[in-house]
Amino acid sequence: MLEHFCECYSNLSGLILCPVLGSITPLFIPNSRIRPIRLIGLCASLITFLYSPVPRIQFDSSTAKSQFVESLRWLPYENINFYLGIDGISLFFVILTTFLIPICISVGWSGMRSYGKEYITAFLIREFLMIAVFRMLDLLLFYVFPESVPIPMFIIIGVWGSRQRKIKAAYQFFLYTLLGSLFMLLAILLILFQTGTTDLQISLTTEFSERRQIFLWIASFASFAVKVPMVPVHIWLPEAHVEAPTAGSVILAGIPLKFGTHGFLRFSIPMFPEATLCSTPFIYTLSAIAIIYTSLTTSRQIDLKKIIAYSSVAHMNLVTIGMFSPNIQGIGGSILPMLSHGLVPSALFLCVGVLYDRHKTRLVRYYGGLVSTMPNLSTIFFSFTLANMSSPGTSSFIGEFPILVGAFQRNSLVATLAALGMILGAAYSLWLYNRVVSGNLKPDFLHKFSDSNGREVSIFIPFLVGLVRMGVHPKVFPDCMHTSVSNLVQHGKFH
């Protein structure tokens, strides 16, 4: 039995089992004992995070094949298995997921008095589902896990949201993702009928006719575009962010927005290369419009959370430009901004959460002069503002610069529009910081509150370390990803 246990952990089953066990245990504890419930949730998430870098130590970056593969029969049908693995692309997204969950639990530490164990259970189940999303190698799981993630998020927004419109935002978020996923289910069924299996590796080697490729690509695009999100199916994101609690916004910005781009990388691009090349002008046009539109829309917002939400849409559409530049620079460069995007908007939402806890408003017009009353938070806010505007030395710059290089090789006009979007991003980021931090304090609206406390600063430090680490010495990421990205480009005959 001990050998089986060790084998399970060597195959990364622990990354899935730990949050599952952590989510079940609090259900047997009375709601009145909130402290042990908090500690169980935090310990389960921390153990998962501390274990998540282990695959990086054992990972063989010289091969593009999936590693730490696990297969288990879970349905009474042949060729449909619980099939999980990990490669150079998904490795760091698993680590990012396990990094954010302990922070989300810590952020909700003081607000966990009502429905405490439900709060812990929702976040840990969400962690299990998100880890599984990045490890799945089965097409049916490719549908089941991403479409299960919105369920705990629906509960998080609907129960712990901050305003009366939270129910509407929760339903809007859930319905958008549900309707988009139906097209993905149709595509998976058609692939199953042709290949006779849901094994992703086998499906990737299957030759589809050009007409079938185009149809399947459109079906998958309809699902992934909602998750990115791309214009015009982005409306759900600002509403969900505004109504979600701080921890909900952190995890929503950090992980689920990557499901769409991860789906393009894992499914649409390698499986339908001809359709991908045919659709590249469409994706370029749609992404460029989204970048300019959302950047201009951001400058007109009055809610701090909506500003960050629209900024996220612009950054993620820049990622899609790189992803559909059929070269190593574009595809490889698009992965780093996805990781960076898991840190920067999440940290900015934390900053807004600190302000909201003290002043009970997120409207920009009520803020100003915070540098005199909250110098620590102002400095932290400035650091993440620099990252949001892709300043050199930050993680955002390291990823977005290769995207522009790859896009220029494909379409100089689209690359120019993307660069213009980055300039607009710098403009609204500095405008926001200036409005909130500089100027005179408005005593009629804001009272003098204490600066960030030790718990809040300790939550920000890992984000700062991650941003600087990725920005100054990002070599570890391309080393692990290069073989997987090269294989993807060669498999699609993009070179």
Curated annotation (Swiss-Prot):
Cell compartment(s), UniProt: Mitochondrion membrane
One Pfam family it belongs to: Proton_antipo_M
Keywords: Electron transport, Membrane, Mitochondrion, NAD, Respiratory chain, Translocase, Transmembrane, Transmembrane helix, Transport, Ubiquinone
InterPro entries: NADH_Q_OxRdtase_chainM/4 (IPR010227), NADH_UbQ_OxRdtase (IPR003918), ND/Mrp_TM (IPR001750)
Reactions that this protein is recorded to catalyse: a ubiquinone + NADH + 5 H(+)(in) = a ubiquinol + NAD(+) + 4 H(+)(out)
Coiled coil: none
Gene Ontology cellular component terms for the protein in this record: mitochondrial membrane; plastid; respiratory chain complex I
EC assignment: 7.1.1.2
Transmembrane intervals: 9-29, 39-59, 89-109, 139-159, 173-193, 214-234, 272-292, 313-333, 335-355, 367-387, 413-433
Main location: mitochondrion
Record-level GO BP terms: aerobic respiration; ATP synthesis coupled electron transport; electron transport coupled proton transport
GO molecular function, one term: ubiquinone binding
Membrane topology: Multi-pass membrane protein
Family statement drawn from the similarity comment of this UniProt entry: Belongs to the complex I subunit 4 family.
Function per UniProt: Core subunit of the mitochondrial membrane respiratory chain NADH dehydrogenase (Complex I) that is believed to belong to the minimal assembly required for catalysis. Complex I functions in the transfer of electrons from NADH to the respiratory chain. The immediate electron acceptor for the enzyme is believed to be ubiquinone.
Protein's recorded name: NADH-ubiquinone oxidoreductase chain 4
